[in-house]
Amino acid sequence: MSRYRGPRVKIIRRLGALPGLTNKTFKSKSSFIDRSTSNKKVSQYRIRLEEKQKLRFHYGLTERQLLKYVRIARKAKGSTGQVLLQLLEMRLDNTIFRFDMAPTIPGARQLVNHRHISVNNGIVDIPSYNCEPGDTITIRNKQKSQSIITKNTNLFQKIKIPSHLTFDSTQLRGFVNQTVNREWVNLKINELLVVEYYSRQV
C-alpha cells in the first residue's frame, strides 16, 4: 500500500486529530467503527485497525514501512509498543517536525528530500534516518533553505518542544538530547492495539 496522498480532511474526521498529517482541526464525525456491533471479534479487529491507521497516517508511512518497524520493535528489548513509538519519533522527518521547522511531517519530509537538512555537518536526504542522542541538526548554508525554515518556525510554533530535543531558533540549530520518552509522543494512540493488529504478520 502506497503513502496516502488524498484529502486530509477525510482522514481527520474519521480518525481524530493527527498533528503530523495536518495542523488543522475539524469536527469529528462518529467513528467509522460500529462499537455497538454484536460481533465482538469483528469489532475488536476494527478497533485495532483504527489505531494502526492513526499511526500510519500521522507518521506518513506506507503499510510496508510500518510493518517493518513493528518487526524491528518486536526484536528489541523492552515493550514492543513503546519501542515502536520511539523508532517512529526518532525518524529525521518527525524530528524536524517536532523542532517546528515544518508544519507537518509531510512538510518535513519534503525539506529532507530537497536536501535542506544537515545532520552532524553532513547533508542527509533520507527522511527515515534514525536520529540518535548527540546528533546536531542544522539547515544548509543557503539563503533559500534558511528562508524556508525561518518562515516555518515563525508561523508554526507549537506549545512546547519535547524535552528530548533542544532548538536554537536564532541559529536554526537543533540538538537531540536523548531518546524520546512515551509521554512526549504528541499523538493520542494505544500502541498495544497496533502491535496486536500485526501479531499474525510478524
Curated annotation (Swiss-Prot):
Matches recorded under CDD domains: S4 (cd00165)
What compartments host this protein? Plastid, Chloroplast
Instruction: Indicate the segments forming the S4 RNA-binding domain, all copies.
Output: 90-159
Q: InterPro entries from the entry?
A: Ribosomal_uS4 (IPR022801), Ribosomal_uS4_bac-type (IPR005709), Ribosomal_uS4_CS (IPR018079), Ribosomal_uS4_N (IPR001912), S4_RNA-bd (IPR002942), S4_RNA-bd_sf (IPR036986)
Molecular functions (GO terms)? rRNA binding; structural constituent of ribosome
Under PROSITE patterns, the record lists: RIBOSOMAL_S4, S4
**Keywords, alphabetical:** Chloroplast, Plastid, Ribonucleoprotein, Ribosomal protein, RNA-binding, rRNA-binding
What's in the GO CC field? chloroplast; small ribosomal subunit
Could you confirm whether the keyword Ribonucleoprotein appears in this record? Answer: yes
Kindly list the biological process annotations in GO that this record carries: ribosomal small subunit biogenesis; translation
Instruction: Specify the superkingdom.
Output: Eukaryota
Q: Which Pfam families match?
A: Ribosomal_S4, S4
So what does this one do? One of the primary rRNA binding proteins, it binds directly to 16S rRNA where it nucleates assembly of the body of the 30S subunit.
What is the annotated quaternary arrangement, including any partners?
A: Part of the 30S ribosomal subunit. Contacts protein S5. The interaction surface between S4 and S5 is involved in control of translational fidelity.
- Family membership: Belongs to the universal ribosomal protein uS4 family.
* Matching HAMAP family: Ribosomal_uS4_B (MF_01306_B)
- PANTHER family listed in its UniProt record: 30S 40S RIBOSOMAL PROTEIN (PTHR11831), SMALL RIBOSOMAL SUBUNIT PROTEIN US4M (PTHR11831:SF4)
Q: What is the protein name given in its UniProt record?
A: Small ribosomal subunit protein uS4c
Organism of origin is Jamesoniella autumnalis (Liverwort)
Name the encoding gene, please: rps4
